[in-house]
Amino acid sequence: MWVALKRFGFLSGLLALTVLSACSAFRKPDKFEGYYINNIPGSAEIDHANYDLTFFLGFFNRIEKTEKDKSQIDFGSIHGTGWLIDWKEVDKKDKKANKFTVYLATNLHVIQALKNREDHPPYNQFDINFVRTVDFRIGKYTDVKQFVAPSKLGLPNSTQAFVAAQPTVLPKTAFIAHDFVNYTLSKDQKNKKQREQQWKVQIKPNKDEVHPYADSAVLELPLFLNNSSDRQIFDHFIQPAIRAYKQLGDSLNIFAYPTLDQFKHSHYYVLGYPYIAKKLPTLFVNQTGKEKTVPGETAQIPNDQPFVSTINEEGPHLGRIKSDKFNGGTWAWNHDNTKNFPFNRQFRGKEYQMYGKGIGITNGSLSRGASGSLVLNNKRQIVAIYFASRITETQEWGLAQLLRWKPRSVLNEEKDSVAYDLIFGNSNTKKYYAQFAKK
């Protein structure tokens, strides 16, 4: 079955397999008249920083189903969007490996598709005997000539395409927002009203309670710069993202820290890779040669050809809000996840429910596959992470989870959920990204 990865038919089918995304739970399929599709933002637009920071993430899994001594093998994929949140330079003491590590923020419901036996504990403790990730791609809509001379593929020199690049190894899980505040819900609640109001301080850990999660996670992707494909990913994807990150103010200034009343005064910019039933020129950038062995990592399976160009009937397109003068979407409302979007999930035998605050953004809804997109405000600060869309007959909104917020002391704004900080932490937050980054 591994040989199938080397066939052109498998490559061309990678972007057309079953696609799962929480965004699709709210979104009418493939409605994109109000958006720019495969339109790279100009350098003066706020969306250009968003474009540089943002990538397609594709997890392609092998699924083995066993029934009465019969095995059936299927392939499925989960696509999402991620963005640069951090990086680790090459260790000067280990120049032979020449490893540069990239950290990409996305939704928790996207990263849960990763099934890597070499993942960090406890994320390698899933039952992955029958489901495993066999191919991972990081992608972007860009100029083909950045990766290969278009003439070698019979293409015009100005050709732009969706580029899906295969790194040397599978990524790992750096951080997920499970149990990020010290609150739980009673397991034996009888109705929704109780569920909204009974988050209580957890005195002792109890797996039978309902635990909080935020739809936020961080992926760790090693790039080995002696490898030609990894070097191209670094040069043409990651370096522009690092420059954009620094131009926005670097880590101390790039993340907004607002009060809940401040959101209504801003415009918001959402850019991602929604999955659309529209023809898509695609360039696959592949690992080639012999299968590699990398200690502590899961090496990806090489292909016969370093570059494969194709036209897919549908796939992940670069999408962004089409608004007057590129001024983004406006604030629609603040919401409490427990009240408005009580999503549930299981992890290591425990039940979790979505927790925290978020905002609705007018004209900010993108199709499935845009899950994990960053949300920039008009001050060029990151305020939230996009996780779903909501559609009515007359209106549509993008939904985003706040990454950090602070309460106003004179108001009872923490009645439903306490103020938290998933990036740097605060007195309420017991699990946040900076803890991992310091290790």
From Swiss-Prot:
> Which N-terminal residues, if any, form the signal peptide?
1-22
Q: State if Phosphoprotein is listed as a keyword.
A: no
Per UniProt, what is the membrane topology? Lipid-anchor
- Grouped into one coarse class, the protein's main location is membrane
Where a lipid (N-palmitoyl cysteine) is covalently attached, the residues are: C23
Listed GO cellular component terms? plasma membrane
- Enumerate the UniProt keywords alphabetically: Cell membrane, Lipoprotein, Membrane, Palmitate, Signal
Q: Where in the cell is it found?
A: Cell membrane
Q: Does Thylakoid count among this protein's keywords?
A: no
Q: Pfam families of this UniProt entry?
A: Mycop_pep_DUF31
**Where are the S-diacylglycerol cysteine lipid anchors?**
C23
Query: What is stated as this protein's family in its record?
Result: Belongs to the MG067/MG068/MG395 family.
Identification of the protein by name: Uncharacterized lipoprotein MPN_582
